[in-house]
Amino acid sequence: MSSTTTDSTELQNLIKLFQNCQTHPRQHFPAKSSAVLVCLYQEQREDKNELRVILTKRSTTLSSHPGEVALPGGKRDQEDKDDIATALREAREEIGLDPSLVTIISVLEPFVNKKGMSVAPVIGFLHDKKAFKQLPNPAEVEEIFDVPLEMFLKDRNRRAEEREHEGERYLLQYFDYYSEDKERSFIIWALTAGILIRVASIVYQRLPEFQERKPSFWNQPN
């Protein structure tokens, strides 16, 4: 079976899985509104097809979350008609991803971080990884890398830290990822990890192997 046929089949499977999670496009945006692109693609690994997700390591010169791992994305511009437009624009600006290479599958309910920023996860599928010519914006992105989506359901290379906010105790999840040559390591945590746990749970139709206990403010209506 060709890679094109396999990708097409995987895309149709993903569309079906996310149908029940589809949200209505937001007509009114909170003052603090942003979107991130959860860009999935399929790759042959160890005789099986594996879904992977594209991530970035933020520049250490940024004033906000320097050096942390994040999904491509950012704040909404007034010209953005919806969350999809925001996510695709930011992905182009940050990592050079051509929007024409991505098929949008779904937009999930927004998460809300501790500072009140609404973050809408936009789920996309990259058909041709080789056509994606990585072009990290040095002002924003230090590195582009990818990880297997399923790792966010496993208890391997994971730890949790208890935090408290307005009397509520919750857990922040930390996932350690090591490059294949073992020379680089990344920590994927907090809201980024929470979004990817949610996406992986939908795709693989199962709960994580660990206790999640996420903060309730992540899912406040806005």
Curated annotation (Swiss-Prot):
Motif (Nudix box): 73-96
Top enzyme category: hydrolase
Cross-referenced PROSITE patterns: NUDIX
E.C. designation(s): 3.6.1.-
Keywords: Hydrolase, Magnesium, Manganese, Membrane, Metal-binding, Peroxisome, Transmembrane, Transmembrane helix
Binding-site residues for Mg(2+), renumbered to this chain: E90, E94
Highest taxon of source: Eukaryota
Segments passing through the bilayer: 186-204
Membrane topology: Single-pass membrane protein
Residue ranges constituting the Nudix hydrolase domain according to the UniProt record: 31-175
Subcellular location: Peroxisome membrane
Tissue expression per record: Expressed in roots, stems and leaves.
Cofactor field: Mn(2+); Mg(2+)
Coiled-coil regions listed: none
Pfam families to which the protein is assigned, alphabetical: NUDIX
GO biological process: coenzyme A biosynthetic process; malonyl-CoA catabolic process; nucleoside phosphate metabolic process
GO CC annotation, single: cytosol
Family: Belongs to the Nudix hydrolase family. PCD1 subfamily.
Protein name in UniProt: Nudix hydrolase 11
